[in-house]
Amino acid sequence: MGSSEDQAYRLLNDYANGFMVSQVLFAACELGVFDLLAEAPGPLDVAAVAAGVRASAHGTELLLDICVSLKLLKVETRGGKAFYRNTELSSDYLTTVSPTSQCSMLKYMGRTSYRCWGHLADAVREGRNQYLETFGVPAEELFTAIYRSEGERLQFMQALQEVWSVNGRSVLTAFDLSVFPLMCDLGGGAGALAKECMSLYPGCKITVFDIPEVVWTAKQHFSFQEEEQIDFQEGDFFKDPLPEADLYILARVLHDWADGKCSHLLERIYHTCKPGGGILVIESLLDEDRRGPLLTQLYSLNMLVQTEGQERTPTHYHMLLSSAGFRDFQFKKTGAIYDAILARK
């Protein structure tokens, strides 16, 4: 093969073997490799890591060396032995003690998303999510499927907490929200975004509105230091009365649903919203031609595999919001994974 053919073949193999890279990351997190190395007083050899994570020495060595190639670990040789330690990347994002840890998100992706993606061809053929085929759970009620057990619900909520620990600040500072003293985070889970709002806009008060099971889990498993300013209310935002607010936040909510349900929800928010109030939509925005960014395209395909929705362009969101009655549409690409849209009543 010529050089261009070689390059094309290597690219093909990179794509075909990409799932192996994901599984290395998932497995190392699942086994606790990065936590073990973070807690150790110094670099550890294969035997020590294998003993610490209760795994075979052979398998552990293979996993550690691949993590080195992926720049997740560093290795040094002393006396003919290899000793491993975390890189800055793994220390920041792959240890559970880090404030920017993404371990729960990666575990959720490995246990749930990855398995659903095994049915991608069926999802494309049928145009629907694959919870029934993957887990035997009917998906007529989307979040009944997503929250199919208490453990799965907690895992998903922890994953979202981690997403906003990294991405919350960029989307909440895309616009000056200090003009909205009373906020409501619809579908706000365990309140990670609400906490970030408190730190950025200490004069505001915020209500997290979510279904009863989520509110119960939030109160049981997550800690709060701003109880006097963050209020949890139970309800279904598709049918129950919405809390009064100057600003309604929808973060990673609309992408779960088809246009019809999005329109229904936005109309309910518009009718409840005070005159001059607003709505902040936080999503990963597609380019107008829908051919990028690649990560957002992949997220949109994930919406097919796991939800009823899709990722959308700014124009698509403008249409949904204006049809519900909102005006003064603005959007900002943050340069991070998630972007922000603000509209007013």
UniProtKB/Swiss-Prot annotation:
Pathway: Aromatic compound metabolism; melatonin biosynthesis; melatonin from serotonin: step 1/2
PROSITE patterns: SAM_OMT_II
Keywords from the UniProt entry: Lipid metabolism, Melatonin biosynthesis, Methyltransferase, S-adenosyl-L-methionine, Transferase
Record-listed substrate binding positions: 256, 302, 306
UniProt effect for mutating residue 81 to E: No effect on enzyme activity
An example Gene Ontology biological process: indolalkylamine biosynthetic process
Impact reported for residue 219 to R: No effect on enzyme activity
Alphabetical list of Pfam families matching this protein: Dimerisation (PF08100), Methyltransf_2 (PF00891)
GO molecular function, one term: S-methyltransferase activity
Expression (tissue specificity): Expressed in the pineal gland (at protein level). In the retina, very low expression is found at the mRNA level, and not at the protein level.
GO CC terms of this entry: cytosol
Induction note: By all-trans-, 9-cis- and 13-cis-retinoic acid and by serum treatment, following starvation, in the retinoblastoma cell line Y79.
Active site residues per record: 255 (proton donor/acceptor)
Effect recorded for residue 305 to M: Found in a patient with bipolar disorder; uncertain significance; reduced enzyme activity
Key word tRNA-binding present: no
Catalytic activity: N-acetylserotonin + S-adenosyl-L-methionine = melatonin + S-adenosyl-L-homocysteine + H(+)
EC code: 2.1.1.4
Effect in UniProt of substituting residue 298 to F: Found in patients with neuropsychiatric disorders; uncertain significance; nearly abolishes enzyme activity
Subunit structure comment from the entry: Homodimer.
Other comments on record: The gene coding for this protein is located in the pseudoautosomal region 1 (PAR1) of X and Y chromosomes.
Family: Belongs to the class I-like SAM-binding methyltransferase superfamily. Cation-independent O-methyltransferase family.
Protein name (database record): Acetylserotonin O-methyltransferase
Lineage start: Eukaryota, Metazoa, Chordata, Craniata, Vertebrata
